């Protein structure tokens, strides 16, 4: 991977930071590199999730794009066009790379998630919050570990933050508009078969 990053001009020896050419404008080759890095990392996260839940995890190829704030909002609206969501974000930083992982859960999936996690009682708001934090920690932690290992650079992670529960996506976007700007976005959709 280092050879590819060097060839694309995304990494310079002696410079511990990953950059993109011309700001955040990605070439097709650079997008392919990020997509492959994300694909391997999400595969590792999905493997952990499948073993934890005892189910098969369906994974499409990750979608990698540089998005302006308005495009990010449109992408989030498109991903969650129906119903309400709960969202968690967690910041990370290391070797000149900084970002935020954002996990969105469709609220309709909490009953299935509780069942898969072996919860036998009623699914209260407190239980939903615990499930939300547990799943976010698993997905974000495993993904970032896989991503960092490929780049051979450790990431420090901040504490996860709940952006909102049981809210329309537009409310989540408006409440967090100041957090996002032109961004390299990697969209990953995890689905558990039969749930």
Features from the language model and the residues they span:
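Composition-driven recognition of glycine/serine/threonine/acidic- and proline-rich low-complexity segments
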Residues: 1-195
């Amino acid at each position: 991977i280092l050879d590819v990053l060097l060839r694309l001009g995304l990494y310079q020896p002696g410079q511990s930071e990953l950059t993109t050419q011309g700001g955040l404008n990605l070439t097709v080759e650079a997008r392919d590199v990020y997509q492959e890095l994300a694909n391997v990392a999400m595969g590792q996260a999905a493997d952990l999730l499948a073993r934890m839940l005892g189910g098969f995890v369906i994974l499409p190829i990750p979608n990698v794009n540089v998005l302006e704030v308005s495009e990010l909002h449109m992408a989030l609206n498109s991903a969650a066009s129906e119903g309400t969501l709960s969202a968690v974000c967690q910041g990370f930083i290391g070797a000149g790379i900084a970002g935020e992982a954002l996990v969105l859960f469709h609220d309709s999936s909490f009953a299935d998630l509780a069942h898969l996690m072996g919860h036998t009682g009623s699914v209260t708001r407190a239980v939903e919050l615990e499930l939300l934090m547990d799943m976010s920690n698993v997905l974000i932690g495993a993904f970032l570990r896989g991503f960092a290992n490929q780049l051979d650079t450790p990431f420090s992670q901040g504490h996860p933050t709940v952006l909102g529960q049981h809210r329309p996506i537009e409310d989540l976007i408006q409440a967090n508009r100041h957090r996002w700007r032109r961004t390299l976005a990697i969209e990953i959709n995890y689905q558990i078969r039969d749930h």
